[in-house]
Amino acid sequence: MKEVAKPLQERFFIPHEIKVMGRWSTEDVEVKDPSLKPYINLEPRLLPHTHGRHAKKHFGKANVHIVERLINKVMRSGGSHYKVAGHFMRREHRSLNSKKVRAYEVVKEAFKIIEKRTGKNPIQVLVWAIENAAPREDTTSVMFGGIRYHVAVDISPLRRLDVALRNIALGASAKCYRTKMSFAEALAEEIILAANKDPKSYAYSKKLEIERIAESSR
């Protein structure tokens, strides 16, 4: 007699809910900013790693999970023009350059610290931080009659997200620069401060500075 194949649930362990890093759910995470909502990817994913398959696609990074995008920003050393108080802060963390496993562990540890301090889902706290740190206006230079002027322009949602994540990672590097604070602790503190709109947050204060300069250039 031919054996009947067992149901898939009996042959393999299939979780009822896929959680990011096996700990945090994205089902109840809410994005209030209508312009950022289409670009903040919160798909349930156990391991936020796409192996760079969106790298050569136009606007492909919009499909990358928001946690992975934070990991990618943490992993970078930053360009030569990114300075805080005259120092290249992110140069202190070259051990994370192009080492995604280590960057993944740093972000995971930061999320644990956020959960312990706030008692809330760290992914939701990250979304709040991004919404508060994403500038709406910036300046660009235009030339009229051989004279260059700075004018205010609106920022696209995808760039708003990029700037917010970059400044969060840069602010974390600044906080642990020449201190005993670990990078994970600094990252957790920066995200919490930005989520609370605290002026001590580098990302939030940078957003206010960018918008203030843009307002004066109207």
UniProtKB/Swiss-Prot annotation:
Protein name per the record: Small ribosomal subunit protein uS7
Sorted UniProt keywords: Ribonucleoprotein, Ribosomal protein, RNA-binding, rRNA-binding
Source organism (scientific name): Pyrococcus horikoshii (strain ATCC 700860 / DSM 12428 / JCM 9974 / NBRC 100139 / OT-3)
InterPro entries reported for this sequence: Ribosomal_uS7, Ribosomal_uS7_arc, Ribosomal_uS7_dom, Ribosomal_uS7_dom_sf, Ribosomal_uS7_euk/arc
UniProt lineage: Archaea, Methanobacteriati, Methanobacteriota, Thermococci, Thermococcales
Functional note: One of the primary rRNA binding proteins, it binds directly to 16S rRNA where it nucleates assembly of the head domain of the 30S subunit. Is located at the subunit interface close to the decoding center.
UniProt GO cellular component terms: small ribosomal subunit
UniProt record similarity statement: Belongs to the universal ribosomal protein uS7 family.
Pfam family, one: Ribosomal_S7
One of the GO biological process terms: translation
Domain of life, per lineage: Archaea
Quaternary state and interactors: Part of the 30S ribosomal subunit.
GO molecular function, one term: rRNA binding
